[in-house]
Protein backbone atom coordinates (compact mmCIF):
# COMPACT_ATOMS: atom_id res chain seq x y z
CA UNK A 1 0.00 0.00 0.00
CA UNK A 2 1.13 3.54 -0.80
CA UNK A 3 -0.28 6.80 0.55
CA UNK A 4 0.36 10.44 -0.36
CA UNK A 5 -0.87 13.37 1.76
CA UNK A 6 -1.59 16.72 0.13
CA UNK A 7 -2.51 19.66 2.37
CA UNK A 8 -5.24 21.93 1.06
CA UNK A 9 -6.68 25.07 2.65
CA UNK A 10 -7.19 25.34 6.40
CA UNK A 11 -7.29 21.99 8.15
CA UNK A 12 -8.32 19.97 5.10
CA UNK A 13 -6.18 17.73 2.92
CA UNK A 14 -6.43 14.81 0.53
CA UNK A 15 -4.96 11.34 0.98
CA UNK A 16 -4.36 9.46 -2.26
CA UNK A 17 -4.18 5.76 -1.45
CA UNK A 18 -3.18 2.82 -3.64
CA UNK A 19 -3.75 -0.76 -2.50
CA UNK A 20 -2.06 -3.77 -4.09
CA UNK A 21 -4.17 -5.95 -6.44
CA UNK A 22 -3.52 -9.00 -4.23
CA UNK A 23 -5.30 -7.33 -1.31
CA UNK A 24 -8.11 -6.28 -3.66
CA UNK A 25 -8.61 -9.89 -4.77
CA UNK A 26 -8.48 -11.08 -1.15
CA UNK A 27 -11.25 -8.62 -0.24
CA UNK A 28 -13.38 -9.82 -3.17
CA UNK A 29 -12.83 -13.44 -2.05
CA UNK A 30 -13.90 -12.50 1.49
CA UNK A 31 -16.96 -10.70 0.10
CA UNK A 32 -17.96 -13.80 -1.88
CA UNK A 33 -17.68 -16.03 1.21
CA UNK A 34 -19.95 -13.61 3.06
CA UNK A 35 -22.54 -13.14 0.30
CA UNK A 36 -22.81 -16.76 -0.85
CA UNK A 37 -24.07 -17.79 2.61
CA UNK A 38 -27.25 -15.81 1.96
CA UNK A 39 -28.05 -17.23 -1.50
CA UNK A 40 -30.39 -20.12 -2.28
CA UNK A 41 -29.82 -21.70 -5.71
CA UNK A 42 -31.70 -24.81 -6.93
CA UNK A 43 -29.37 -27.80 -7.05
CA UNK A 44 -27.01 -26.46 -4.38
CA UNK A 45 -27.15 -26.37 -0.63
CA UNK A 46 -27.37 -22.87 0.85
CA UNK A 47 -23.92 -21.30 0.81
CA UNK A 48 -22.44 -23.89 -1.54
CA UNK A 49 -22.92 -22.14 -4.88
CA UNK A 50 -19.65 -22.38 -6.91
CA UNK A 51 -17.80 -19.10 -7.47
CA UNK A 52 -17.73 -19.35 -11.31
CA UNK A 53 -21.50 -19.90 -11.40
CA UNK A 54 -22.04 -16.96 -9.02
CA UNK A 55 -19.95 -14.63 -11.19
CA UNK A 56 -21.66 -15.89 -14.34
CA UNK A 57 -25.12 -15.24 -12.89
CA UNK A 58 -24.55 -12.09 -10.80
CA UNK A 59 -21.26 -10.70 -12.10
CA UNK A 60 -18.13 -10.18 -10.05
CA UNK A 61 -19.11 -6.49 -9.79
CA UNK A 62 -21.93 -7.46 -7.41
CA UNK A 63 -19.22 -8.24 -4.82
CA UNK A 64 -17.45 -4.91 -5.12
CA UNK A 65 -19.42 -2.96 -2.50
CA UNK A 66 -18.97 -5.68 0.14
CA UNK A 67 -15.31 -5.95 -0.83
CA UNK A 68 -14.87 -2.19 -0.43
CA UNK A 69 -16.53 -2.35 2.99
CA UNK A 70 -13.82 -4.86 3.95
CA UNK A 71 -10.76 -3.21 2.40
CA UNK A 72 -11.42 0.53 2.86
CA UNK A 73 -11.33 0.83 6.68
CA UNK A 74 -8.05 -1.11 6.88
CA UNK A 75 -6.42 0.80 4.01
CA UNK A 76 -7.59 4.18 5.32
CA UNK A 77 -6.37 3.40 8.86
CA UNK A 78 -2.92 2.38 7.58
CA UNK A 79 -2.77 5.46 5.33
CA UNK A 80 -3.43 7.98 8.12
CA UNK A 81 -0.78 6.27 10.26
CA UNK A 82 1.71 6.44 7.39
CA UNK A 83 0.87 10.11 6.70
CA UNK A 84 1.10 10.96 10.41
CA UNK A 85 -2.19 12.87 10.44
CA UNK A 86 -4.99 13.01 13.03
CA UNK A 87 -8.47 13.12 11.41
CA UNK A 88 -11.25 14.81 13.39
CA UNK A 89 -14.18 13.85 11.15
CA UNK A 90 -15.30 11.10 8.80
CA UNK A 91 -13.47 11.32 5.45
CA UNK A 92 -15.07 11.97 2.06
CA UNK A 93 -14.11 8.86 0.05
CA UNK A 94 -13.86 8.90 -3.74
CA UNK A 95 -13.10 5.59 -5.49
CA UNK A 96 -11.02 6.21 -8.61
CA UNK A 97 -10.42 2.58 -9.57
CA UNK A 98 -11.64 -0.72 -8.15
CA UNK A 99 -11.72 -3.96 -10.12
CA UNK A 100 -10.54 -7.53 -9.94
CA UNK A 101 -6.81 -8.14 -10.55
CA UNK A 102 -5.99 -4.42 -10.38
CA UNK A 103 -4.72 -2.00 -7.76
CA UNK A 104 -7.37 -0.08 -5.83
CA UNK A 105 -6.92 3.68 -6.06
CA UNK A 106 -9.03 6.02 -3.95
CA UNK A 107 -8.84 9.44 -2.34
CA UNK A 108 -9.96 10.53 1.11
CA UNK A 109 -10.67 14.19 1.78
CA UNK A 110 -9.84 14.59 5.45
CA UNK A 111 -10.31 17.28 8.09
CA UNK A 112 -7.39 17.05 10.52
CA UNK A 113 -6.61 18.34 13.99
CA UNK A 114 -5.46 21.96 13.67
CA UNK A 115 -2.02 23.32 14.41
CA UNK A 116 -1.89 25.17 17.73
CA UNK A 117 0.37 28.21 17.99
CA UNK A 118 0.80 28.66 21.71
CA UNK A 119 0.88 32.20 23.00
CA UNK A 120 1.95 33.23 26.49
CA UNK A 121 1.21 30.43 28.95
CA UNK A 122 3.90 30.92 31.60
CA UNK A 123 3.81 33.75 34.10
CA UNK A 124 0.08 34.35 33.58
CA UNK A 125 -1.32 36.99 35.92
CA UNK A 126 -4.24 35.60 37.91
CA UNK A 127 -6.36 37.33 40.52
CA UNK A 128 -5.82 36.15 44.07
CA UNK A 129 -9.08 34.99 45.63
CA UNK A 130 -10.00 36.01 49.19
CA UNK A 131 -10.40 32.93 51.39
CA UNK A 132 -10.93 34.59 54.78
CA UNK A 133 -14.05 33.44 56.64
CA UNK A 134 -15.77 36.19 58.65
CA UNK A 135 -18.05 35.93 61.68
CA UNK A 136 -20.87 37.01 59.37
CA UNK A 137 -20.16 34.03 57.08
CA UNK A 138 -20.46 31.69 60.07
CA UNK A 139 -23.69 33.37 61.25
CA UNK A 140 -25.20 33.07 57.76
CA UNK A 141 -24.33 29.37 57.64
CA UNK A 142 -25.85 28.94 61.10
CA UNK A 143 -28.99 30.72 59.92
CA UNK A 144 -29.24 28.35 56.94
CA UNK A 145 -29.05 25.39 59.32
CA UNK A 146 -31.73 27.01 61.46
CA UNK A 147 -33.95 27.51 58.39
CA UNK A 148 -33.55 23.86 57.37
CA UNK A 149 -34.67 22.71 60.83
CA UNK A 150 -37.60 25.13 60.98
CA UNK A 151 -41.09 23.71 61.47
CA UNK A 152 -44.22 24.92 59.72
CA UNK A 153 -46.88 25.94 62.24
CA UNK A 154 -50.39 27.19 61.59
CA UNK A 155 -50.72 30.96 61.67
CA UNK A 156 -53.92 31.55 63.65
CA UNK A 157 -54.15 35.27 62.87
CA UNK A 158 -52.85 37.66 60.26
CA UNK A 159 -52.40 37.44 56.50
CA UNK A 160 -50.21 35.60 54.01
CA UNK A 161 -46.68 37.03 53.97
CA UNK A 162 -43.63 36.34 51.86
CA UNK A 163 -41.98 33.18 53.23
CA UNK A 164 -45.27 31.72 54.48
CA UNK A 165 -46.89 28.59 53.07
CA UNK A 166 -50.48 29.08 51.95
CA UNK A 167 -52.75 26.03 51.66
CA UNK A 168 -55.02 26.92 48.74
CA UNK A 169 -57.62 25.73 46.28
CA UNK A 170 -57.23 27.19 42.81
CA UNK A 171 -58.79 26.87 39.36
CA UNK A 172 -57.54 28.63 36.25
CA UNK A 173 -59.56 29.99 33.33
CA UNK A 174 -58.46 31.24 29.90
CA UNK A 175 -61.08 33.06 27.82
CA UNK A 176 -63.60 32.04 30.48
CA UNK A 177 -62.89 28.32 30.03
CA UNK A 178 -61.19 26.03 32.56
CA UNK A 179 -58.07 24.35 31.15
CA UNK A 180 -56.39 21.01 31.80
CA UNK A 181 -53.90 21.03 34.68
CA UNK A 182 -55.15 24.37 35.98
CA UNK A 183 -56.93 23.10 39.09
CA UNK A 184 -55.68 22.08 42.53
CA UNK A 185 -57.09 21.48 46.01
CA UNK A 186 -55.35 21.92 49.36
CA UNK A 187 -52.15 22.78 47.55
CA UNK A 188 -49.29 23.95 49.80
CA UNK A 189 -47.76 26.93 48.02
CA UNK A 190 -44.52 28.36 49.44
CA UNK A 191 -44.84 32.10 48.85
CA UNK A 192 -41.70 33.50 47.25
CA UNK A 193 -40.57 30.15 45.86
CA UNK A 194 -41.46 31.06 42.27
CA UNK A 195 -43.31 27.76 41.89
CA UNK A 196 -46.26 29.28 40.04
CA UNK A 197 -46.20 31.56 37.01
CA UNK A 198 -44.94 35.14 37.55
CA UNK A 199 -47.33 37.40 39.46
CA UNK A 200 -49.41 34.62 41.04
CA UNK A 201 -47.74 34.32 44.45
CA UNK A 202 -47.46 38.09 44.92
CA UNK A 203 -51.26 38.42 44.63
CA UNK A 204 -51.86 35.80 47.33
CA UNK A 205 -49.90 37.94 49.81
CA UNK A 206 -52.27 39.84 52.12
CA UNK A 207 -55.10 37.28 52.06
CA UNK A 208 -56.48 35.83 55.31
CA UNK A 209 -57.54 32.24 55.97
CA UNK A 210 -60.97 31.68 54.40
CA UNK A 211 -60.62 34.55 51.91
CA UNK A 212 -60.96 34.17 48.14
CA UNK A 213 -59.59 36.23 45.28
CA UNK A 214 -59.41 36.30 41.49
CA UNK A 215 -55.72 36.33 40.58
CA UNK A 216 -55.00 37.87 37.17
CA UNK A 217 -51.81 36.69 35.43
CA UNK A 218 -50.41 36.01 31.97
CA UNK A 219 -48.63 32.83 30.92
CA UNK A 220 -45.04 33.43 29.75
CA UNK A 221 -44.48 33.51 25.98
CA UNK A 222 -42.13 30.52 26.29
CA UNK A 223 -44.58 28.45 28.42
CA UNK A 224 -44.27 24.72 27.71
CA UNK A 225 -47.99 24.31 26.86
CA UNK A 226 -48.23 26.08 23.50
CA UNK A 227 -52.01 26.56 23.77
CA UNK A 228 -51.51 28.68 26.92
CA UNK A 229 -48.29 30.51 26.04
CA UNK A 230 -48.65 34.29 26.24
CA UNK A 231 -52.34 34.19 27.16
CA UNK A 232 -53.96 36.08 30.08
CA UNK A 233 -55.58 33.86 32.71
CA UNK A 234 -57.76 34.22 35.79
CA UNK A 235 -57.25 31.92 38.76
CA UNK A 236 -59.97 31.67 41.40
CA UNK A 237 -58.04 31.19 44.64
CA UNK A 238 -59.24 30.34 48.16
CA UNK A 239 -56.87 30.31 51.14
CA UNK A 240 -57.71 27.56 53.64
CA UNK A 241 -54.76 27.82 55.97
CA UNK A 242 -51.60 29.84 56.47
CA UNK A 243 -48.43 28.27 57.84
CA UNK A 244 -45.32 30.11 58.94
CA UNK A 245 -41.82 28.94 59.75
CA UNK A 246 -40.95 28.56 63.42
CA UNK A 247 -37.19 28.64 63.84
CA UNK A 248 -35.55 26.51 66.55
CA UNK A 249 -33.69 28.34 69.31
CA UNK A 250 -29.93 28.59 68.82
CA UNK A 251 -28.51 26.65 71.77
CA UNK A 252 -26.51 23.52 72.57
CA UNK A 253 -29.54 21.27 71.92
CA UNK A 254 -29.93 22.77 68.46
CA UNK A 255 -26.21 22.18 67.81
CA UNK A 256 -26.43 18.49 68.77
CA UNK A 257 -29.55 18.10 66.62
CA UNK A 258 -27.78 19.71 63.66
CA UNK A 259 -24.55 17.69 63.99
CA UNK A 260 -24.14 14.60 66.17
CA UNK A 261 -20.37 15.13 66.26
CA UNK A 262 -20.62 18.31 68.36
CA UNK A 263 -21.84 18.90 71.93
CA UNK A 264 -22.20 22.67 72.10
CA UNK A 265 -23.19 25.62 69.94
CA UNK A 266 -19.62 26.95 70.10
CA UNK A 267 -18.30 23.63 68.80
CA UNK A 268 -20.81 23.79 65.94
CA UNK A 269 -19.71 27.32 65.06
CA UNK A 270 -16.05 26.24 65.07
CA UNK A 271 -16.83 23.30 62.80
CA UNK A 272 -18.83 25.51 60.43
CA UNK A 273 -15.89 27.93 60.25
CA UNK A 274 -13.47 25.10 59.41
CA UNK A 275 -15.81 23.75 56.72
CA UNK A 276 -16.25 27.22 55.23
CA UNK A 277 -12.48 27.79 55.20
CA UNK A 278 -11.90 24.48 53.41
CA UNK A 279 -14.70 25.24 50.96
CA UNK A 280 -13.36 28.72 50.18
CA UNK A 281 -9.84 27.36 49.73
CA UNK A 282 -11.11 24.65 47.38
CA UNK A 283 -13.21 27.19 45.47
CA UNK A 284 -10.22 29.57 45.19
CA UNK A 285 -8.00 26.78 43.84
CA UNK A 286 -10.60 25.88 41.22
CA UNK A 287 -10.99 29.52 40.22
CA UNK A 288 -7.24 29.94 39.71
CA UNK A 289 -7.04 26.70 37.71
CA UNK A 290 -9.94 27.75 35.49
CA UNK A 291 -8.48 31.23 35.03
CA UNK A 292 -4.97 30.13 33.96
CA UNK A 293 -6.42 27.60 31.52
CA UNK A 294 -8.75 30.19 29.98
CA UNK A 295 -5.92 32.74 29.68
CA UNK A 296 -3.59 30.23 28.02
CA UNK A 297 -6.39 29.24 25.63
CA UNK A 298 -7.19 32.86 24.79
CA UNK A 299 -3.51 33.59 24.03
CA UNK A 300 -3.21 30.73 21.52
CA UNK A 301 -3.86 30.92 17.78
CA UNK A 302 -6.03 28.08 16.46
CA UNK A 303 -8.24 27.64 13.41
CA UNK A 304 -10.75 25.19 14.89
CA UNK A 305 -12.52 22.97 12.33
CA UNK A 306 -16.31 23.07 12.53
CA UNK A 307 -16.27 19.25 12.62
CA UNK A 308 -14.55 19.30 16.03
CA UNK A 309 -17.16 21.67 17.41
CA UNK A 310 -19.95 19.46 16.03
CA UNK A 311 -18.41 16.40 17.68
CA UNK A 312 -18.14 18.23 21.00
CA UNK A 313 -21.74 19.44 20.69
CA UNK A 314 -22.92 15.85 20.19
CA UNK A 315 -20.97 14.83 23.30
CA UNK A 316 -22.48 17.69 25.33
CA UNK A 317 -26.02 16.77 24.23
CA UNK A 318 -25.42 13.16 25.30
CA UNK A 319 -24.12 14.36 28.69
CA UNK A 320 -27.18 16.61 29.06
CA UNK A 321 -29.48 13.72 28.14
CA UNK A 322 -27.87 11.55 30.84
CA UNK A 323 -28.41 14.29 33.45
CA UNK A 324 -32.06 14.56 32.40
CA UNK A 325 -32.55 10.79 32.71
CA UNK A 326 -31.23 10.95 36.29
CA UNK A 327 -34.08 13.41 36.97
CA UNK A 328 -36.66 11.12 35.34
CA UNK A 329 -36.86 13.18 32.15
CA UNK A 330 -35.79 12.84 28.53
CA UNK A 331 -34.95 15.24 25.71
CA UNK A 332 -38.43 15.13 24.18
CA UNK A 333 -40.03 16.19 27.47
CA UNK A 334 -37.38 18.87 27.92
CA UNK A 335 -38.07 20.27 24.44
CA UNK A 336 -41.80 20.27 25.19
CA UNK A 337 -41.46 22.06 28.54
CA UNK A 338 -38.97 24.66 27.31
CA UNK A 339 -40.40 25.25 23.85
CA UNK A 340 -37.04 24.48 22.26
CA UNK A 341 -35.69 21.80 19.91
CA UNK A 342 -32.43 20.01 19.08
CA UNK A 343 -31.11 22.83 16.87
CA UNK A 344 -31.86 25.52 19.47
CA UNK A 345 -30.28 23.43 22.23
CA UNK A 346 -27.10 23.03 20.19
CA UNK A 347 -27.07 26.75 19.42
CA UNK A 348 -27.26 27.46 23.18
CA UNK A 349 -24.36 25.07 23.78
CA UNK A 350 -22.18 26.13 20.85
CA UNK A 351 -20.12 28.78 22.65
CA UNK A 352 -19.28 26.34 25.45
CA UNK A 353 -18.42 23.66 22.88
CA UNK A 354 -15.99 26.02 21.11
CA UNK A 355 -14.43 26.89 24.47
CA UNK A 356 -14.04 23.22 25.43
CA UNK A 357 -12.40 22.31 22.12
CA UNK A 358 -10.00 25.28 22.28
CA UNK A 359 -8.98 24.46 25.87
CA UNK A 360 -8.43 20.76 25.07
CA UNK A 361 -6.26 21.59 22.06
CA UNK A 362 -4.18 24.12 24.01
CA UNK A 363 -3.63 21.74 26.93
CA UNK A 364 -2.56 19.00 24.48
CA UNK A 365 -0.09 21.45 22.92
CA UNK A 366 1.30 22.40 26.35
CA UNK A 367 1.70 18.71 27.25
CA UNK A 368 3.76 18.26 24.09
CA UNK A 369 5.75 21.50 24.49
CA UNK A 370 6.68 20.74 28.11
CA UNK A 371 7.20 16.98 27.55
CA UNK A 372 4.69 16.18 30.29
CA UNK A 373 4.59 12.45 30.98
CA UNK A 374 2.75 10.14 33.38
CA UNK A 375 4.47 7.15 34.97
CA UNK A 376 2.97 3.72 35.44
CA UNK A 377 3.26 4.28 39.21
CA UNK A 378 1.18 7.46 38.97
CA UNK A 379 -1.55 5.66 37.04
CA UNK A 380 -1.56 2.82 39.59
CA UNK A 381 -1.79 5.33 42.45
CA UNK A 382 -4.76 7.02 40.77
CA UNK A 383 -6.54 3.67 40.30
CA UNK A 384 -5.99 2.88 44.00
CA UNK A 385 -7.34 6.31 44.93
CA UNK A 386 -10.46 5.67 42.82
CA UNK A 387 -10.92 2.25 44.44
CA UNK A 388 -10.82 3.84 47.90
CA UNK A 389 -13.18 6.63 46.86
CA UNK A 390 -15.82 4.27 45.43
CA UNK A 391 -15.29 1.49 47.98
CA UNK A 392 -14.42 -1.02 45.26
CA UNK A 393 -11.53 -3.48 44.78
CA UNK A 394 -8.67 -2.22 42.59
CA UNK A 395 -9.27 -5.04 40.08
CA UNK A 396 -12.91 -4.00 39.74
CA UNK A 397 -11.84 -0.42 38.96
CA UNK A 398 -9.35 -1.69 36.36
CA UNK A 399 -12.04 -3.86 34.79
CA UNK A 400 -14.48 -0.93 34.69
CA UNK A 401 -11.86 1.28 33.03
CA UNK A 402 -10.97 -1.40 30.49
CA UNK A 403 -7.87 0.46 29.36
CA UNK A 404 -5.95 2.91 31.53
CA UNK A 405 -4.90 4.94 28.48
CA UNK A 406 -7.74 7.45 28.93
CA UNK A 407 -6.91 7.75 32.63
CA UNK A 408 -3.26 8.41 31.77
CA UNK A 409 -4.32 11.17 29.36
CA UNK A 410 -6.52 12.72 32.07
CA UNK A 411 -3.54 12.73 34.43
CA UNK A 412 -1.40 14.45 31.79
CA UNK A 413 -4.05 17.16 31.43
CA UNK A 414 -4.15 17.57 35.21
CA UNK A 415 -0.36 17.91 35.24
CA UNK A 416 -0.54 20.51 32.47
CA UNK A 417 -2.96 22.60 34.53
CA UNK A 418 -0.72 22.14 37.59
CA UNK A 419 2.16 23.45 35.47
CA UNK A 420 0.18 26.56 34.48
CA UNK A 421 -0.75 27.26 38.12
CA UNK A 422 2.81 26.73 39.39
CA UNK A 423 4.16 29.10 36.74
CA UNK A 424 1.47 31.78 37.14
CA UNK A 425 2.46 35.24 38.33
Swiss-Prot record:
GO function term, MF aspect, one: protein folding chaperone
SUPFAM superfamilies: FKBP-like, Triger factor/SurA peptide-binding domain-like, Trigger factor ribosome-binding domain
Compartments, as annotated in UniProt: Cytoplasm
Signal peptide: none
Enzyme Commission number: 5.2.1.8
Ranges for domain PPIase FKBP-type: 163-248
Top EC category: isomerase
Catalytic activity: [protein]-peptidylproline (omega=180) = [protein]-peptidylproline (omega=0)
Assigned GO CC terms: cytoplasm
Superkingdom classification of source: Bacteria
Similarity comment: family membership: Belongs to the FKBP-type PPIase family. Tig subfamily.
Function per UniProt: Involved in protein export. Acts as a chaperone by maintaining the newly synthesized protein in an open conformation. Functions as a peptidyl-prolyl cis-trans isomerase.
Protein's name according to its UniProt entry: Trigger factor
Amino acid sequence: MAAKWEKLEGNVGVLTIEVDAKEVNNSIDAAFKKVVKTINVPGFRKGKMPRPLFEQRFGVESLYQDALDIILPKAYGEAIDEAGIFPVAHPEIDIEKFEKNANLIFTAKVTVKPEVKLGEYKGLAVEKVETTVTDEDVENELKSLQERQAELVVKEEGTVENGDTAVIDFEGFVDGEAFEGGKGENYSLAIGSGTFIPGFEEQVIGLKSGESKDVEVSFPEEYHAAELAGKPATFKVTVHEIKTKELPELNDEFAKEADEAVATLDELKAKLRTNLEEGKKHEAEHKVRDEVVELAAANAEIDIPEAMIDTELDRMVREFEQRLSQQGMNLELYYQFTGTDADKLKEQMKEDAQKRVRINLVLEAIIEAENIEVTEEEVTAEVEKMAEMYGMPVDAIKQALGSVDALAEDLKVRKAVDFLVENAA
